[in-house]
């Protein structure tokens, strides 16, 4: 029986609006593409979420991916508030689930920097019953340890949890830990999947 709903944040309770953010600076399409490839599309971007290195050290790493757009990279990363926008349904959905008796948690790859600069988009977090951000644990999904850490921290039974994430590899990692998991695309698509698990 499912008692606990665990949400990813990016592209689940928020929209990851990196393209809109980069284009908001008025760069040409070519420059926007280069900045994206050097930053949000790069492997090094995950270091923000891992929370081990200092922000400036990570930014220096990203600049090395394409030094020709260093100025633009630094400009985009100096103001990251536009990277995330809250989904309108976030708080109502959380409250509805809690009213029905479910406990609601978050488990997300998220950076200190984004958390600081996107506070308004994350105003639903205080409504939740708890959760884990990758930067705080120095672990990132799909590492199995981060799922185990959430279960241990809140004394949750894996068989009583369902996890919603927009990335298939993270869904599969949750299932490997005995957690029911749904690949999230939209709330409308997720509701019948939750219902199949007995979540009303």
Where are these regions (language model features)?
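Active-site neighborhood of HAD-like aspartate-dependent phosphohydrolases
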Residues: 1-40, 176-177
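Hydrophobic alpha-helical core bundles mediating ligand binding, dimerization, or RNAP-core interactions
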Residues: 22, 39, 58-63, 77-80, ...
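Short, surface-exposed acidic
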Residues: 27-38, 67-78, 199-200
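Asp-based, Mg2+/Mn2+-dependent phosphohydrolase catalytic module
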Residues: 1-7, 111, 116-200
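Generic structural signal for small/hydrophobic residues in well-ordered secondary structure
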Residues: 8-11, 51, 97, 106, ...
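Alpha-helical elements of Rossmann-like donor-binding domains used by nucleotide-donor carbohydrate transfer enzymes
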Residues: 20, 43, 57, 61, ...
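A metal-dependent, Asp-based hydrolase signature
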Residues: 45-76
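Short, acidic loop-to-helix structural element flanking the phosphoryl-transfer center
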Residues: 56, 74-105, 116, 144
């Amino acid at each position: 029986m499912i008692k606990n709903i665990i949400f990813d944040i990016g592209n689940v309770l928020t929209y990851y609006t990196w393209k809109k953010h980069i284009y908001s600076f008025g760069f040409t399409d070519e420059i926007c593409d280069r900045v994206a490839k050097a930053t949000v599309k790069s492997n090094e971007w995950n270091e923000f979420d891992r929370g081990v290195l200092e922000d400036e050290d990570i930014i220096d790493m990203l600049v090395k991916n394409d030094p020709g757009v260093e100025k633009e990279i630094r400009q985009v990363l100096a103001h990251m508030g536009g990277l995330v926008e809250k989904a309108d349904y976030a708080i109502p959905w959380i409250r509805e689930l809690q009213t029905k008796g479910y406990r609601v948690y978050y488990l997300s790859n998220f950076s200190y920097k984004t958390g600081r600069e996107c506070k308004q988009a994350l105003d639903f977090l205080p409504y939740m019953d708890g959760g884990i951000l990758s930067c705080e644990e120095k672990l990132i999904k799909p590492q199995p340890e981060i799922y185990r850490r959430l279960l241990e921290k809140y004394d949750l039974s894996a068989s009583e949890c369902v996890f919603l994430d927009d990335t298939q590899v993270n869904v599969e990692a949750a299932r490997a830990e005995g957690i029911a998991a749904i690949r999230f695309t939209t709330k409308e698509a997720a509701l019948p999947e939750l219902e199949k698990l007995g979540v009303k």
